[in-house]
Amino acid sequence: MLRITLMVAFAFGAISPALAAGGDKAFGEYLSGECVTCHLPSGRQVGTIPAIVGWPEDSFIAIMQSYAKKERDNQVMQTVAAKFKDDELAALAAYFGGLKPK
């Protein structure tokens, strides 16, 4: 299923090949410091802040890209998402996608 999703994303230009190659989980953990100030690594939701643990990598990347392009409304997330390069988004997606809710 993931393979089909990625092929469709490539076809429509939603995800670059660099992102789909998969990220470095250790690098993602290193980069996650700012994320976990609001999004708990335990997978619990806090108020209106969504849990991001266990998200599919392609969904995580697509959502972060839409924040960076200001297609989704949240000034904090727009600012945070715009900071990351493709390899960093892939690493974050791999890290959070690989965590299991506690």
Predicted regions span which residues?
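Axial heme c-ligation environment in periplasmic c-type cytochrome domains
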Residues: V46-V53, A68-K100
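Cleavable N-terminal signal peptides
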Residues: M7-V8, A18
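Extracytoplasmic/secreted proteins, especially bacterial periplasmic and envelope-associated proteins
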Residues: F27-Y30, S59-A62, V76-T79, A91
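Regular, well-ordered alpha-helical segments
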Residues: T37-L40, A62, K69, T79
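Electrostatic cytochrome c docking/interface patches
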Residues: A14-S32, T48-P50, I61, S66, ...
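Positively charged n-region of N-terminal signal peptides that target proteins for export
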Residues: M1-I4
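The canonical Cys-X-X-Cys-His
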Residues: G33-S42, L92
